[in-house]
């Protein structure tokens, strides 16, 4: 089993993890209603995805 040669101080340990922060989510703008939405997902406000309106089982 591997054993560390020297103990890392808290400052060195935390500075190694400085680049591990989460990146903010990139948002797209809905072309139908103009609200912010996640890319590759349907709009939560109007329900459109890729300029298509949602169809329900009742409508079919």
Curated annotation (Swiss-Prot):
UniProt-listed SUPFAM superfamilies: Zn-binding ribosomal proteins
Keywords: Ribonucleoprotein, Ribosomal protein
InterPro entries assigned: Ribosomal_bL32, Ribosomal_bL32_bact, Ribosomal_zn-bd
Region described as Disordered: spans on this chain: 1-27
One record GO biological process: translation
Basic residues composition-biased segments: 13-25
Entry's Gene Ontology molecular function annotations: structural constituent of ribosome
One GO CC term, this protein: large ribosomal subunit
PANTHER family attached to this UniProt entry: 50S RIBOSOMAL PROTEIN L32, LARGE RIBOSOMAL SUBUNIT PROTEIN BL32
Entry's family note: Belongs to the bacterial ribosomal protein bL32 family.
Protein name as it appears in the record: Large ribosomal subunit protein bL32
Natural source organism: Protochlamydia amoebophila (strain UWE25)
């Amino acid at each position: 089993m591997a054993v560390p040669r020297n103990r890392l101080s808290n400052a060195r340990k935390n500075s190694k993890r400085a680049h591990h922060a989460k990146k903010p989510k990139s948002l797209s703008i809905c072309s139908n209603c103009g609200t912010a939405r996640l890319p590759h997902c349907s709009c939560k406000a109007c329900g459109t995805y890729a300029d298509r309106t949602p169809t329900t089982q009742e409508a079919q």
